């Protein structure tokens, strides 16, 4: 059994034991618009693993966001989110493609809120057949796949929240994420000292899950607060039980 399949089974068990109560969607404090950025994926020792392209555009009443990472080993992480921001942020559709040697398996998922239709295509390795799982799923109002840094920018200063993410095991399941503010950290930008807000994003486990499972990697994010909040960097895995990588501007 390859790690990819073991990871899916482990994630499925973890989600079954997790709390799944829905929360309210996050209020819009800073509306999103046209954005272009070029982040990079690096190991914690500073080695560059992938170059990225982040493109965000507004079309009518929807915002379309795409984050594409091309790894040096040929792997691809391609994440597309469409969301609305009429008073609150709401994920309307989500697509993710992960493939190549940097990932334990090939994965392609698609989820649409309005229709409730989802599709998952995954292959454990080159010698395994592709499996396709399709069906319908009710997307929580507070589900924010591919939107966590945006949500953190919109939290009031020094406050946290609990939101949802849809994980694919391969069937979609809801997992709660706790967004917790930590102590501010001083950072240097353009040779000027500034205070950055640091957050920990961690799955919220039920009692039995917390007793039975090993520690799951958390995501750490640094946000520059103010009248125009900015994402600085994040450290965490790009897939379940994956290595901790750093995402930051190139």
Annotate each predicted stretch with a short phrase:
Residues 115-121:
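Short, intrinsically disordered, low-complexity segments enriched in Ser/Thr and Pro
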Residues 1-4:
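N-terminal secretory signal peptides that target proteins for export/translocation
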Residues 22-115, 159-250:
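Acidic, serine/threonine-rich low-complexity disordered tracts
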Residues 8-18:
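Bacterial N-terminal signal peptides
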Residues 6-9, 181:
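Short hydrophobic "helix-edge" motifs at membrane interfaces and signal-peptide entry regions
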Residues 121-159:
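Surface-exposed beta-loop interaction hotspot
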Residues 10, 61-62, 131, 135:
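General secondary-structure edge motif
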């Amino acid at each position: 059994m390859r790690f990819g399949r073991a990871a899916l089974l482990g994630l499925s068990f973890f989600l079954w034991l997790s709390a799944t109560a829905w929360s309210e969607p996050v209020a819009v404090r800073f509306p999103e618009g046209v954005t272009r950025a070029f982040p990079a994926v690096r190991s914690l020792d500073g080695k560059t693993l992938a170059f990225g392209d982040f493109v965000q555009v507004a079309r009518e009443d929807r915002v379309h966001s795409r984050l594409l990472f091309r790894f040096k080993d040929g792997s691809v992480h391609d994440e597309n989110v469409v969301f609305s921001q009429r008073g609150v942020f709401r994920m309307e559709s989500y697509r993710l493609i992960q493939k190549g040697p940097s990932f334990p398996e090939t994965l392609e998922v698609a989820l649409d809120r309005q229709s409730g239709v989802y599709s998952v295509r995954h292959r454990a390795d080159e010698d395994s057949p592709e499996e396709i799982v399709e069906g319908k799923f009710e997307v929580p109002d507070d589900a924010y796949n591919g939107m966590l840094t945006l949500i953190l920018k919109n939290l009031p200063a020094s406050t946290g929240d609990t939101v949802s993410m849809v994980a694919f095991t391969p069937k979609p399941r809801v997992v709660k994420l706790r967004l917790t503010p930590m102590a501010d950290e001083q950072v240097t930008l353009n040779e000027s000292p500034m205070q950055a807000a640091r957050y920990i994003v961690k799955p919220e486990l039920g009692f039995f899950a917390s007793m039975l499972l090993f520690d799951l990697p958390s995501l750490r994010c640094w946000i520059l607060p103010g009248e125009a909040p900015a994402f600085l960097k994040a450290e965490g895995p790009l897939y379940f039980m994956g290595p901790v990588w750093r995402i930051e501007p190139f």
